[in-house]
């Protein structure tokens, strides 16, 4: 009888933005895996890449709306009839660094569109809105302030228009007057986006900067779980930090060595640490990220098991001579990273072109940059204390 009651219940409609990106696609997959509980309505830009992706996940319980989340009428169409709105989509770095005005317009505008569209519904109180924020809103947190929680001061880094856009977007959610809203502040997601590997952001992070990472699959489980009937009333109208737990606390150089290891490459051998920023990134360990998992129960993969499987998969690929031949070696990666640092917004670009405001933000001063020891001179790599 209980099972029949579940399967005979009308499915809930979940509107998802950003469903073609990492966290979004994992969320869509998780929701579709629970059919007939949910009908997923996904907004996607009509690019050739997105259309190919949608073909791979086509499902009777998936409705795709082609459009732009900056367009209010499109958002209204997607929100109408939805029980849940999961606003995962955003312009993120490094694209956000290149197009700051579009980033502000897209990220803030889409959030305001969703809030307005929910208020246009016959009963706005029946719509539950989950907004995805970011750890970048709290800005640079070097040792000894490398711990944080929701409630800490909002202080986005200089030149970080993505973070600034998310600050104003989250504030709009907090002040929306909606009955059901929540902000899920995302951290770095593993695996990292490959596209960022060719961008100056590679040098914007101090080697010893920390993040408490999340896995993409567990992020998707988190978002799907918040759509379940068993989520308590007290979950709503709060902000939460999302991570996959203390087993994912890494300094930047540690995480990169985990990723590079199967290729026989070390961070220390390919990055010129004298050109890596001292300040002005973001990230910290969390004192409160267990709170979200205590409610939504999304941490299902032991960190050690996940990393061991990822390493084994990469090592198996590297045993294929054709694949191995396409991968960089230490020399080629080092040369490429040097080229990247000279791109606009890169750290070498800042120094060579006397971009004093950028130098001040990322190094404090030109003198401080010149005092950074090289690896050969004894630069200290360490894991900040937990």
Where are these regions (language model features)?
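Glycine-rich NAD(P)-binding loop of the Rossmann-fold in SDR/ketoreductase-type enzymes
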Residues: 70, 98, 102-113, 156, ...
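Glycine/proline-rich active-site loop of Rossmann-fold NAD(P)-dependent oxidoreductases
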Residues: 167, 191-201, 226-240
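Mid/C-terminal beta-alpha module of Rossmann-like enzyme folds, strongest
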Residues: 226-295, 301-326, 330-385
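Catalytic helix-loop patch of NAD(P)-dependent Rossmann-fold dehydrogenases
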Residues: 105, 137-181, 204-206
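Conserved Rossmann-fold NAD(P)-dependent oxidoreductase catalytic core, especially the SDR/UDP-sugar
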Residues: 91, 109-159
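NAD(P)H-binding glycine-rich loop region in Rossmannoid oxidoreductase-like domains
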Residues: 58-106
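Substrate-positioning beta->alpha
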Residues: 164, 204-229
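N-terminal Rossmann NAD(P)H-binding glycine-rich loop of SDR-like oxidoreductase domains
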Residues: 6-34
């Amino acid at each position: 009888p209980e099972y029949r009651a579940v399967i005979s219940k009308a499915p809930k409609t979940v509107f998802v933005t950003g469903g073609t990106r990492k966290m979004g696609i994992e969320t869509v997959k998780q929701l579709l895996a629970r059919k007939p509980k949910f009908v997923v309505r996904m907004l996607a830009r009509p690019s050739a890449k997105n259309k190919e992706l949608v073909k791979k996940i086509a499902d009777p319980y998936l409705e795709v709306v082609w459009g732009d989340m900056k367009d209010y009428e499109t958002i209204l169409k997607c929100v109408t009839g939805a029980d849940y709105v999961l606003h995962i989509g955003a312009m993120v770095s490094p694209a956000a660094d290149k197009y700051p005005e579009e980033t502000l317009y897209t990220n803030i505008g889409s959030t305001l569109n969703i809030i307005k569209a929910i208020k246009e519904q016959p009963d706005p109180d029946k719509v539950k809105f989950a907004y995805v924020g970011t750890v970048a809103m709290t800005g640079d947190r070097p040792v000894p302030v490398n711990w944080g929680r929701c409630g800490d001061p909002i202080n986005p880094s200089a030149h970080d228009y993505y973070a600034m856009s998310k600050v104003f977007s989250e504030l709009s959610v907090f002040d929306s007057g909606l009955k059901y809203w929540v902000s899920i502040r995302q951290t770095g997601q593993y695996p990292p986006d490959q596209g960022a590997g060719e961008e100056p952001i590679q040098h914007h992070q101090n080697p010893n900067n920390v993040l408490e990472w999340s896995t993409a699959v567990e992020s998707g489980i988190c978002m799907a779980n918040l759509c379940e009937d068993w989520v308590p009333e007290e979950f709503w109208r709060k902000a939460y930090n999302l991570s996959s737990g203390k087993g994912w606390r890494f300094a930047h150089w540690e995480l990169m060595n985990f990723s590079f290891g199967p290729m026989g490459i070390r961070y220390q051998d390919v990055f010129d640490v004298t050109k890596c920023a001292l300040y002005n990134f973001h990230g910290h360990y969390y004192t409160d990220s267990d709170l979200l998992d205590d409610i939504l129960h999304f941490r299902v993969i032991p960190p050690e098991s996940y990393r061991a499987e990822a390493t084994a998969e990469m090592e198996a690929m590297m045993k294929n001579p054709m694949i191995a031949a396409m991968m960089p070696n230490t020399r080629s990666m080092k040369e490429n990273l040097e080229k990247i640092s000279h791109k606009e917004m890169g750290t070498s670009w800042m120094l060579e072109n006397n971009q004093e405001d950028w130098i001040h933000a990322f190094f404090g001063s030109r003198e401080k940059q010149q005092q950074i020891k090289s690896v050969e001179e004894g630069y200290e790599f360490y894991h900040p204390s937990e």
